[in-house]
A protein has these predicted regions:
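Metal/cofactor-centered catalytic core regions of large enzymes
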Residues: 1-401
Length: 401
């Protein structure tokens, strides 16, 4: 009989404390996270996260798929930023293949990746504010998120699971009118950010619930593997887009927001400022978008255009072979990391020279950031645990995989 890991058990260390189950159905845990809390009255003594409720076996599934068939699976790792996962996986396989991606495809990837970051941060801000009691911000954020989802649907046909970035470039040229709609959104979005800040940043209830709450030092954040706004909220100036640039990010000008306090409010400020920087990158991409192809010149790897398939026998043959047999990737291994909305998302891909990956492992930013939660919550109130969970912005699909 297969060995089964027992459910984590926490025993009260003292007679005056008790054990409280929080989740996995609790709305503030943002998915199916279970927390075991040892509490003394309203004060939290210890926290033990219990994960695994959303395990889907995606990493193992990848081993049975052709390389191009893995792309739709990556959408479902972190379902709030599917294009970021598409990009990370595509970059890893492209490095193994030695593909050179056309500039237009790279700039489109950057623009859509930043729209994905904004989309994810809007979900975070709306739900985080709702957890603490600010319902209006939740409604405002989802108003703008709807605009972004419509842009995704326009360019890819899907609102969430887009599968738009492919190995070798992107799936399709954006349709007519797409860039105009992106520009319309980019022009008015900064004023929307001002609305969010007017409701929250100086709100005395918001500051009381976030300032000095769930503090984590830079040393602890680094030691526990934190990344993204959670790390930068503790004063560590590190962003992969700037410090290890990929996909033409070195061609764009942007600041990396950093706060030193390490509390819930600091992480909030970092993400709100990131909204401003991301929309600035989108505007730069619109202004400087290069012309040219959107796919690498690699007919044995990249699906041909549909128009060519109507007139060229070679294109039809290549399409048939890629779909039915996949494409072989030279033997080797590579680790590719990108800056997701939650931190360092990484893909470790091992090839044995066949058309299917030998191993695909996803490095989860959320799993590392979750390790900070017990230290954040020690000595705080139960209500502060809710604020702490929201401040690290976890997605359980990415953690459990």
């Amino acid at each position: 009989m297969a060995h089964m890991t027992p459910t984590p058990v926490m025993d009260a260390a003292q007679d005056r404390t008790m054990i409280l189950n929080m989740g996995p159905q609790h709305p503030s845990t943002h998915g199916v996270l279970r927390l075991l809390l040892e509490i003394d009255g309203e004060t939290v003594v210890r926290v033990m996260p219990d994960i695994g409720y959303l395990h889907t076996g995606i990493e193992k599934t990848c081993e049975a798929k052709f390389y191009q068939q893995v792309v739709p699976l990556t959408d479902r790792i972190d379902y709030l930023c599917p294009m970021t996962n598409n990009l990370c996986y595509a970059l890893a396989v492209e490095r193994l293949l030695g593909l050179e991606i056309p500039p237009r495809a790279q700039w489109l990837r950057v623009m859509l990746n930043e729209l994905t970051r904004i989309n994810s941060h809007l979900v975070w801000l709306g739900t985080h504010a709702l957890d603490i009691g600010a319902m209006t911000v939740f409604l405002y954020c989802f108003r703008e998120r709807e605009d972004i989802l419509r842009l995704f649907e326009m360019v890819s046909g899907q609102r969430m699971m887009t599968s738009y970035f492919r190995v070798g470039g992107i799936a399709l040229e954006p349709p007519l009118g797409f860039f105009e709609r992106v520009k319309h959104f980019a022009d008015r979005f900064p004023a929307r950010i001002d609305e969010y800040e007017n409701l929250l940043t100086s709100n005395p209830i918001w500051t009381m619930r976030t300032k000095g709450v769930a503090t984590i030092t830079a040393e602890d954040a680094i030691a526990l593997g934190a990344s993204g706004p959670t790390l930068r909220g503790s004063g560590v100036d590190w962003d992969l887009r700037r410090d290890m640039p990929y996909s033409s990010y070195d061609k764009f000008q942007f600041k990396v927001p950093v706060a030193k306090e390490g509390d819930v409010f600091a992480r909030y400020i970092c993400r709100v400022q990131e909204l401003r920087e991301s929309i600035g990158i989108v505007q730069q991409a619109l202004a400087g978008m290069p012309e040219g192809p959107i796919k690498a010149d690699a007919p044995k790897v990249v699906l041909p255009d549909r128009e060519k398939m109507k007139t060229q026998m070679e294109a039809l043959i290549y399409h048939f072979k890629i779909v039915t047999e996949g494409f072989a990737v030279p033997a080797g291994e590579v680790y590719q990391a990108v800056e997701s909305p939650r931190g360092e998302m990484g893909y470790y891909v091992v090839s044995d020279g066949t058309a299917k990956p030998y191993r695909v492992h996803m490095r989860s930013a959320c799993l590392a950031n979750l390790q900070l939660l017990p230290k954040m919550c020690e000595g705080r109130l139960i209500a502060d645990v809710v604020a702490a969970i929201g401040s690290i912005d976890i997605v359980l699909g990415e953690i459990d995989r």
